[in-house]
Amino acid sequence: MTTFYTVVSWLIILGYWLLIAGVTLRILMKRRAVPSAMAWLLVIYILPLVGIVAYLSVGELHLGKRRAERARAMWPSTAKWLNDLKACKHIFAEENSAVASALFQLCERRQGIAGVKGNQLQLLTSSDDVMQALIRDIQLARHNIEMVFYIWQPGGMADQVAESLMAAARRGVHCRLMLDSAGSVAFFRSPWAGMMRNAGIEVVEALKVNLMRVFLRRMDLRQHRKMIMIDNYIAYTGSMNMVDPRYFKQDAGVGQWVDLMARMEGPVATAMGIVYSCDWEIETGKRLLPPPPDANIMPFEQASGHTIHTIASGPGFPEDLIHQALLTSVYAAREYLIMTTPYFVPSDDLLHAICTAAQRGVDVSIILPRKNDSLLVGWASRAFFSELLAAGVKIYQFEGGLLHTKSVLVDGELSLVGTVNLDMRSLWLNFEITLVIDDAGFGADLAEVQDDYISRSRLLDARLWVKRPFWQRVVERLFYFFSPLL
């Protein structure tokens, strides 16, 4: 019996070390950033069992077998649709401004289509303005309404949007709503999901959280897009979830969320429609291609029409494109660069690009919320401040609530707005969307919004920053080391 227990003990020890060695080899063989690999290895060696379970759960990008098969199956029809769209040469821009040219060329080569021109854009900077405009557009909708949100939180004006959407469905408008399972958990636990389905709305719970499948699909891969398409001609996107800030996370101690949305009319709605089509097919298996190009996507004749490229990220979309777009934008800056984000945990490449821009004389400003709803990200963000300040970057801490706007403005002409945070999850993992706009008029509008943010912010003083307590520096460096995992 003693021999039996001895053999079993040695087999357990051998299996334990083989498991650690196997996961180590798996990490080393995966193409990933070195800091991320080192962080994972450290976690596994310090807490082997916890680290291995965590890595197998959230360390690799698993879309799930069924969704991955759908993503592969949809591309032939999607490619044909894109080729048909290319035949509508009148909607595509033939040239761009000097500051935007490299980025638009990158997007065209990687996504297969050029930026679309002749769009009309309107920046909406308050939740009331967004929801009032949306309710009006829903009431006028005639054919179809598609929406996707990370969070839909019942309460306040969000309920008025829901009521108008149900009324549209009852009068025959085809309405589809896709919401992230984790972000919209309060919605799916409320009566609203059933009420909408009873009204005729197709409601889909995207990337459903299921702990029984934790090793088969990455549970923290989330549908983070915020998009609305109406009649294939009107579109919205930006940072705002379908929430009324007066009713959302009031106990978080960060104030009301501050967001920005863009309302668009023109052919960009068609480009966004194909993104929604791909998301819908990956999640449901149902093909929902936008209608073929026709006169409805004729561009505006006014010279003020905006040129826009839509960048989508996530499994099934061009890998690393949003990260490349941000790098290209930063390196294109010659005069000034303004960035707003609620969560700032940049890649090494992006951090160095921002610092280099400041060191070569570009006026670089980053606007962040002073109080953050994520303790981990808040501390990790602070770990980058010293390097940024030393390079000459101005860091503004917004004091008017949780600044949730994601925007980049380069030299007053190239703008990026959408759902992408400057952190690892948005850059490498989630389903995201960003609009790239080449237009000085829109740039002036965005600059006005950013100036308002700055007026409600406190400029971080580099001299005071270096005097912060030692314990804060220790906590910052700890979270900095694990920032590749956040």
Curated annotation (Swiss-Prot):
Gene that this polypeptide is encoded by: clsA
Any one GO molecular-function label of the UniProt entry: cardiolipin synthase activity
Organism for this UniProt entry: Cronobacter sakazakii (strain ATCC BAA-894) (Enterobacter sakazakii)
Pfam families named in the record: PLDc_2, PLDc_N
Membrane-spanning intervals of the chain: 3-23, 38-58
Keyword Ion transport: no
UniProt xrefs under SMART domains: PLDc
Physiological role: Catalyzes the reversible phosphatidyl group transfer from one phosphatidylglycerol molecule to another to form cardiolipin (CL) (diphosphatidylglycerol) and glycerol.
Domain PLD phosphodiesterase, chain residue ranges per copy: 219-246, 399-426
Principal localisation: membrane
GO terms of biological process kind: cardiolipin biosynthetic process
InterPro entries, per the entry: Cardiolipin_synthase (IPR022924), CL_synthase_A (IPR030840), CLS_N (IPR027379), PLD-like_dom (IPR025202), PLipase_D/transphosphatidylase (IPR001736)
Compartment annotation: Cell inner membrane
Enzyme Commission designation: 2.7.8.-
Protein family (similarity comment): Belongs to the phospholipase D family. Cardiolipin synthase subfamily. ClsA sub-subfamily.
Gene Ontology CC terms: plasma membrane
Membrane topology: Multi-pass membrane protein
Record-given protein name: Cardiolipin synthase A
Keywords assigned by UniProt, alphabetized: Cell inner membrane, Cell membrane, Lipid biosynthesis, Lipid metabolism, Membrane, Phospholipid biosynthesis, Phospholipid metabolism, Repeat, Transferase, Transmembrane, Transmembrane helix
